[in-house]
Swiss-Prot record:
PANTHER family linked: CCP84AC-RELATED (PTHR12236:SF86), STRUCTURAL CONTITUENT OF CUTICLE (PTHR12236)
InterPro entries linked: CHIT_BIND_RR_consensus (IPR031311), Insect_cuticle (IPR000618), Insect_Cuticle_Struc_Prot (IPR051217)
Annotated TM spans: none
Name under which the protein is recorded: Cuticle protein
Amino acid sequence: MAFKFVIFAAVVAVARAGLIASPAVSYAAAPALVAAPVAKVAYAAAPIAKVAYAAQPEEYDANPHYSFSYGISDALTGDSKSQQESRSGDVVQGSYSVVDPDGTKRTVDYTADPHNGFNAVVRREPLAAKTIVAAAPVATKVIAQPAVAYAAPVAKTISYAAPVATKTYVAQPALSYAAPLTKTYVSQPALSYAAPVAKTISYSAPLATKTYVSQPAISYAAPLAKTYVSQPALSYAAPAYAYHH
């Protein structure tokens, strides 16, 4: 506003100068001009008028009718079930079936009406055994193998000759003392052999032969009598010396 006022005063002065004699020209520095602060313009979003929606009244069917059905049969997972239902006014009729894990089919028939309420009848029936269709045989080339025959082993009868047990007893020589010589004989222990499988082994009874050696005759020779012979008398003859001249 101050800037506008200065300009307006200058214009008035110029207009008056044309009517009044010109005074002495003098020059003065122009006053410093200061810009007035400009107020910031604030922008606000225009308010959006809310649209009011009137609630629509729900449609009411005094005599409803519908009917639906579905079924699932999955051979991979074994899931098999179905359902169907229909309605006429306030009376509902329907049924559903499902295959239980024990292999029986369970079917439920149900009805509902304002007078009798809800009623259901359950039926169980075994499923028919599945018919397995055998795959057509594939022709294969068969090569006949030669028949291999193995002769049954012949059971051999092996006989073992029983060893002849020979017992030899050597009589002890009579010693110088008079104590009697006592001999003790131990009986042969009984031996038993288990027969091997598929082998017939026969043993002949051992032949025990006892050989006794007679007591050696001991003779003592009479001691030799020593004869002492007297020493012969020895005589020495003096040699005869002869000297010849």
